[in-house]
Structures are given as C-alpha cells and as structure tokens.
C-alpha cells in the first residue's frame, strides 16, 4: 500500500475529523485514524464509538490498496512541522510498518491492525428518514441553538439539539431549563413529521465542517443513529434516547408586550 499526498491537505482533513477522538478512550484502537485506500480514494475515519467521522481525499499517485490504523497524535504532530510538500506513505501490509518520506527525511511509524477498528453504524433502511438540506440551513440551526444546550447528566435529552421535521418547516430547539432557543425555517418543506435529539459533541463537530462548505447535506436517521453526508465528509452519531420537553408550552402565545431593539446596540 503506497500513496502520495499533500502534507497540508492531509493535515487539514485530519484536523477536521480528529476532534472526535477522546482523550479517555476505553479502546486503544480509537487513538488511531483508520486509513482505507481503494482505487484513487483515501478514506480516513476517526471515532469515539458514539460519533464517527469520515473524510475522503482523491489521490493521483497510488500503488496497491489496503487498510491500516495510524496513531493519530503521532501523525498530526509530525504533519504540523512540515511545510507544504508531497509526502509518500509506504505501508508494509504484513508488518503494518509505515514509512513516511518527505523532502527532509524518512520517518517510521508503527501501524495497528485495521480489523480492530469499530464498524461504522448503518442507518436501517426499513426505518430510515431521509432529506436533502442546504448546508447553510444546517449550520444556522446548530449555530443558533447549541449555546443553549445543557450539561446535565441527570437529563441527557437537554444536552442535545432537538430537530423537529414538519410538513412545511424545520425546527431546531435547545434549552437548559433556564433559557430556550427555537430556530424555525419556513423555507424548507420536509413533507413529513419526525424528530430526533442530536448530541452536543457531534453537533459542534458538524458545525465546524459546515462553516467551510456551501453545498447540499444529505440527512438520514432511524431510531438509533443520524448520518450527515456532504462533499468530502460523513458524520454518523448515536442519537440521544428519550422524550424532549414540550417546548411550545413554555413559549407565550399571546404576550401583549413586544420590544424591537437594534441588535448591534444591544
């Protein structure tokens, strides 16, 4: 397994997905990136079991295919020291030894067994709900609500963003029982009624990726997991189980007092 890749491009992709890696992993293999080279496509996966991120990079100079788990911290620390240059990865598939050749020298990394890396959860087709959304809409929905989520171990449903699909609108809700934010978009029509609770950590990771993208996002979910697919990236997260509070009941419907203020002055 051998390929050539830009040092800065690789680092950019690893930094995007590397934030999911926990400092307290229960499985040592989760301290690694999974490199999966097939044809001219390199898929790199990072996971903490609850959330999995996958990034895809198209390559031009490839010899053979294969998989290997690469120590995340070691690789990222090395890449941060390289200026922009082509890097050659040469992996011995029997020993899993990784030889990294740069313009300044040669480096060796001990890879891990890729078969130990956990499988990505799949959305069950018989229970799947799917829709296409503009990346701007998903970004705004997360960005305008995530600050209001709670950090409450006793009420985990409050620690995520409640996403509610209706026939003619899409609503994002977050509350910590002291403040509540409802962000509703009328410019989309899901044409179905459903909902899920998106945990805070993967929501934050997705927001970071969406801030650089202008595209369509494919959203699909079942009763256990949600998946977001956009150009070059995929994120799969386990959903928070439970019933979200009836947020509409605490929003006044006939409050006679209204105030309009300048946002910048405020």
Regions found by a protein language model. Name each.
Residues 1-266:
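Structural preference for solvent-exposed beta-strand-turn elements
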């Amino acid at each position: 397994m051998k390929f050539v890749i830009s040092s800065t491009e690789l680092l950019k992709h690893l930094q995007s997905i590397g934030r999911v890696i926990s400092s307290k992993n229960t499985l040592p293999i989760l301290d690694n990136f999974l490199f999966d080279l097939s044809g001219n496509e390199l898929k790199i996966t990072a996971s903490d079991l609850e959330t999995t991120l996958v990034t895809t990079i198209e390559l031009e100079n490839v010899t053979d295919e294969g998989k290997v788990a690469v120590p995340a911290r070691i690789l990222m620390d090395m890449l941060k020291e390289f200026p922009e240059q082509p890097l050659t990865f040469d992996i011995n598939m029997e020993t899993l030894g990784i030889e990294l050749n740069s313009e300044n020298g040669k480096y060796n990394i001990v890879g891990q067994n890729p078969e130990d890396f956990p499988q990505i959860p799949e959305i069950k087709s018989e229970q799947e709900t799917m829709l296409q959304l503009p990346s701007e809409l998903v970004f705004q929905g997360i960005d305008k609500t995530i600050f209001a989520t709670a950090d409450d171990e006793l009420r985990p449903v409050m620690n995520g963003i409640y996403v509610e699909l209706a026939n003619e609108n899409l609503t994002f809700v977050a509350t910590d029982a002291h403040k509540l934010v409802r962000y509703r978009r009328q410019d989309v029509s899901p044409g179905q009624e459903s909902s899920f609770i998106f945990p805070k950590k993967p929501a934050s990771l997705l927001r970071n990726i969406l801030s650089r993208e202008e595209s369509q996002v494919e959203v699909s979910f079942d009763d256990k997991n949600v998946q977001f697919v956009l150009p070059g990236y995929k994120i799969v997260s386990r959903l928070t189980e439970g019933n979200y509070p009836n947020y509409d009941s605490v929003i006044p419907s006939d409050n006679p007092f209204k105030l309009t203020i300048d946002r910048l002055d405020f």
